[in-house]
Structure formats: structure tokens, C-alpha cells
């Protein structure tokens, strides 16, 4: 499809945002937009500069015939500090304190903007590491794990306290619960994670 440059820039930006940590070849873009590589390279340079300036992330270029571009979501240090400070203020509310020294967080973990900030901060810290999956124990960690996995473009895996028959065979470990001081069990479906995976 032949698009005006402004339309092409918008579409290209969306494709990069939708496919983080994924190599997209220049040929893909030239074919898609019916444009010369030189024009696509100029477009990418504009997007790269804007992403870095606005704290959206960075665009890495991979040279060679099989090369292309990779969008890596990354939060600016000042943006991360501001988000962390705002979260700290919300968590310091005395009404959040629960018996046993716990803090009520469910409402914060239900807010998309909080998850967005937390997910991007965590993903930024691991953007140069080889991560195959993000793992969490059900259920409180699920929203954050899913957001981080989205930014890293990897699967997220849930470890459960009780296995479901629909998950097939599982691997399990016993641990001492911090909240109840009882020995409990964590179970993971063997099909959800390949042997030797790098897990966050």
C-alpha cells in the first residue's frame, strides 16, 4: 500500500510499538509501503530520535542482508524516578497498613497507568538480558508479570499453589509461606516452560 509519509510514519511507529524486541527487516517495510530503502531509513531515523527524546524507548539497527530494526521499550531515568516517587506517596497512606505488617496494594495493581510504569521500569532493567519468560506466583503478581512480559515480548508463566487437571503433568516444590509460616506447595505445568529457559 502506498502511503503519504505522515501516514507511513504513524503506521511504522505503531508496528514497532506492537512488536517490541522483534527484528523487523527493512525489506518488510519497503514491500509494505512500496517505498525505497533510503526513504524507510529516513523514517526510522525520525522515529528513533523521537522515541529517545520522549522516553518511549530505543531503536537498534542490525546491519547486513538479514538486518533491520528492533524496538526496545525503555523508560528514562527521570520518568522512572517520578513514577516511583508517586507510587511511594500512594503506598505511604496509613490506611493501607494491614494486620501483620502488610500493605494493601490491590487497587494500585488494578490501575493501567501504574502497571504501565512498573512494567516498563522492570523491562528496562532487563532489556539487554536474554529473557525467555516472565514467571510469577498466582495471583497478585499476574498483572505486573503480564505487563513486563508484554514489554519484553516473551510469554508469562503462572506458578500455582494448586494444579488444575487441564494443565497436565506438573513439577512442584515445597516452601515455607511468609504469611502463614506453613509449608505450602508451588506447582508449574511442565508444558509451560522449556528446560534451560532464562526466567525473570
Enumerate the predicted regions with their spans.
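PRPP-associated nucleotide enzymes
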Residues: 2-200
Amino acid at each position: 500500500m502506498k502511503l503519504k509519509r505522515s501516514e507511513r510514519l504513524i503506521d511504522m511507529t505503531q508496528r514497532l510499538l506492537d512488536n517490541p524486541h522483534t527484528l523487523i527487516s527493512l525489506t518488510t517495510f519497503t514491500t509494505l509501503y512500496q517505498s525505497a530503502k533510503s526513504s524507510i531509513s529516513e523514517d526510522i531515523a525520525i522515529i528513533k530520535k523521537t522515541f529517545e527524546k520522549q522516553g518511549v524507548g530505543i531503536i537498534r539497527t542490525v546491519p547486513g542482508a538479514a538486518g533491520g530494526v528492533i524496538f526496545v521499550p525503555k523508560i528514562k531515568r527521570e520518568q522512572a524516578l517520578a513514577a516511583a516517587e508517586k507510587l511511594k506517596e500512594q503506598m505511604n497512606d496509613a490506611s493501607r497498613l494491614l494486620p501483620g505488617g502488610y500493605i494493601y496494594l490491590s487497587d494500585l495493581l488494578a490501575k493501567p497507568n501504574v502497571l504501565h510504569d512498573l512494567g516498563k521500569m522492570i523491562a528496562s532493567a532487563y532489556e539487554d538480558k536474554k529473557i525467555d519468560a516472565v514467571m510469577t506466583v498466582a495471583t497478585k503478581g499476574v498483572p505486573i508479570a503480564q505487563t513486563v512480559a508484554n514489554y519484553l515480548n516473551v510469554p508469562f508463566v503462572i506458578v500455582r499453589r494448586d494444579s488444575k487437571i487441564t494443565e497436565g503433568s506438573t513439577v512442584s516444590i515445597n516452601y515455607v509461606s511468609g504469611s502463614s509460616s506453613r509449608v505450602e506447595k508451588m506447582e508449574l505445568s511442565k508444558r509451560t516452560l522449556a528446560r534451560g529457559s532464562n526466567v525473570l
